[in-house]
């Protein structure tokens, strides 16, 4: 009769399975179009030229995405020394960080049993595994937004924790300059404030930190934005270059503002995300009522 491993080994064995599964194939394939080759070429140009502030594709500035993800790829290459082995590392490490944050939050707000279930559920989600094995910005964005939610919930739902709150703001700021939607986790404060108002009107005790503590999210968020916007602003002020101004206008206004207000591509019908949830969130979507 097979003997089950002791309960204390379940979590280490699960982590070993996840690391081996997500890292499988690392260094065995080339970047695949459409996005991976562009990011790798921009990161390679940073390493070759020593100019990391602005990503280039050939001689032209690459203004479609901020450089944060390409910085991570270039840093991974500096550590590993091989583009084929390093271009997927940021996504892999971001996936592992996301898994740890989810498990830790489930343990803090629930129990070790909840942590195991949350960890296994996220790891088994089809879209999560796909993004973890692609050199795209999305997995890094997920890690940053999860870090922001982790910090917010530790402060709001566990106990007052200003360092965690600062981390939430900084992660949201870095997420925003990584891909524009990184600020979304901060909107969690709106239903939390509404819940406090509801309890107060019913004459019930209002647990949690004082709302004034949330004011530190603003400087923390600006600090996260400054990771890239500060050196970009300095370059704009001290370098009278029309190409640099055109790059900043293209990225900050067209690629960000215009995409929000009037997207010119990736148009989808209203039910698009329902379709994504039902298919790419398998097998967890089978549990939907």
Which stretches of residues belong to each language-model region?
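Transmembrane-helix signature of polytopic, membrane-embedded enzymes
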Residues: 11-12, 102-124
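Extracytosolic helix-loop segments that constitute the early lumenal/periplasmic catalytic or substrate-binding loops
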Residues: 20-23, 38-61, 68, 75
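Transmembrane-lumen/periplasm boundary regions of multi-pass, lipid-linked membrane glycan transferases
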Residues: 39-45, 49, 170-174, 178, ...
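Loop-to-helix entry region of an early transmembrane alpha helix in multi-pass inner-membrane enzymes
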Residues: 67, 71, 80-97, 135
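Short acidic/glycine- and proline-prone juxtamembrane loop motifs at membrane-interface regions
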Residues: 88, 133-141, 181
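Transmembrane-helix motifs of polytopic, lipid-linked glycan transferases
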Residues: 89-110, 147
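Specific aromatic-rich, kink-prone transmembrane helix
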Residues: 99-101, 130, 141-158, 171
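Membrane-interface transmembrane helices that cradle and orient dolichyl/undecaprenyl
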Residues: 107-109, 148-167, 175
């Amino acid at each position: 009769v097979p003997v089950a491993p002791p309960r204390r080994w379940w979590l280490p064995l699960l982590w070993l399975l996840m690391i081996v599964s997500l890292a499988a194939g690392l260094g065995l394939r080339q970047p695949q179009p459409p996005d991976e080759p562009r990011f790798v070429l921009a990161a390679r140009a940073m390493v070759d030229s020593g100019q990391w502030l602005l990503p280039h594709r050939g001689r032209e500035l690459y203004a479609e995405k901020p450089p944060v993800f390409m910085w991570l790829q270039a840093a991974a290459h500096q550590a590993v020394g091989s583009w084929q082995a390093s271009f997927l590392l940021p996504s892999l490490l971001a996936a592992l960080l996301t898994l740890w944050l989810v498990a830790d939050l489930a343990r803090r707000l629930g129990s070790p049993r909840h942590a195991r279930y949350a960890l296994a559920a996220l790891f088994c989600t089809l879209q999560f595994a796909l993004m973890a094995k692609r050199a795209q910005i999305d997995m890094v964005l997920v890690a940053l937004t999860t870090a922001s939610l982790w910090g917010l919930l530790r402060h709001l739902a566990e106990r007052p924790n200003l360092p965690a709150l600062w981390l939430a703001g900084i992660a949201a700021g870095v997420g925003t300059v990584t891909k524009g939607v990184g600020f979304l986790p901060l909107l969690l404060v709106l239903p939390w404030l509404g819940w406090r108002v509801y309890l107060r009107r019913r004459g019930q005790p209002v647990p949690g930190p004082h709302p004034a503590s949330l004011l530190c999210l603003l400087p923390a968020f600006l600090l996260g934005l400054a990771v890239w916007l500060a050196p970009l602003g300095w370059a704009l002020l001290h370098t009278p270059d029309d190409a640099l101004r055109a790059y900043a206008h293209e990225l900050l206004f067209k690629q960000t503002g215009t995409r929000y207000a009037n997207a010119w591509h990736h148009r989808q019908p209203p039910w698009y995300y329902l379709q994504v949830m039902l298919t790419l969130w398998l097998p967890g979507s089978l549990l939907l009522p």
